[in-house]
């Protein structure tokens, strides 16, 4: 639940540099996640930690490796005022939660202990004793995330094999 905080316009090439895409396995992606702006990220991030960033998170390339790298590191979610649309869609498609909340993204600090209740949209900063209300996911998107991604959701509904 520890926060890693970054600025605006975090590009997909910063999340996972293109030079590391020759091995698209989750473990390989995780080992290089955020290394160009935070060389210690991959070695210090723990399951359940949260990334908070400025607007337009995930801009740049359309590849799904960027949200997959974050998910593979164990990141619980990303909180930002806005996301590049293709990153948003790719994150949902792989079952990785992203939360839009400008005030929380501005006020949460690096190192804070934060929790997010995806069913209600409530973001709680335990360190600061503050809460913010984000819009919860619509039911169909929540279902995709809970299933672990679009393909798993379709399989559960018998639409795909």
What are these regions (language model features)?
Residues 16-18, 22-120:
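Feature captures the catalytic cores and cofactor-binding loops of soluble hydro-lyases/lyases
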Residues 10, 58-64, 145-155:
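Conserved phosphate/anionic-ligand binding catalytic regions in large, soluble enzymes, centered on
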Residues 1-23:
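Polybasic, low-complexity association/targeting segments
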Residues 94-161:
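Acidic, glycine-rich flexible loop/linker segments
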């Amino acid at each position: 639940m520890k926060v890693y905080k970054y600025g605006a316009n975090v590009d997909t090439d910063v999340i996972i540099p293109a030079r590391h895409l020759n091995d698209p396995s989750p473990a390989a992606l995780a080992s290089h996640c955020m290394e160009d702006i935070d060389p210690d990220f991959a070695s210090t991030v723990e399951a359940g930690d949260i990334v908070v960033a400025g607007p337009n998170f995930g801009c740049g390339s359309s590849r799904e490796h960027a949200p997959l790298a974050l998910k593979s590191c164990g990141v619980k979610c990303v909180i930002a005022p806005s996301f590049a649309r293709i990153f948003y869609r790719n994150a949902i498609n792989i079952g990785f939660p992203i939360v839009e909340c400008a005030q929380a993204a501005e006020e949460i600090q690096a190192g804070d202990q934060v929790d997010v209740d995806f069913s209600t949209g409530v973001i709680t900063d335990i360190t600061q004793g503050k809460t913010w209300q984000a819009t919860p996911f619509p039911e169909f998107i929540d279902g995709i995330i809970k299933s672990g991604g679009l393909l798993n959701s379709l399989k559960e509904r018998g639409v795909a094999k």
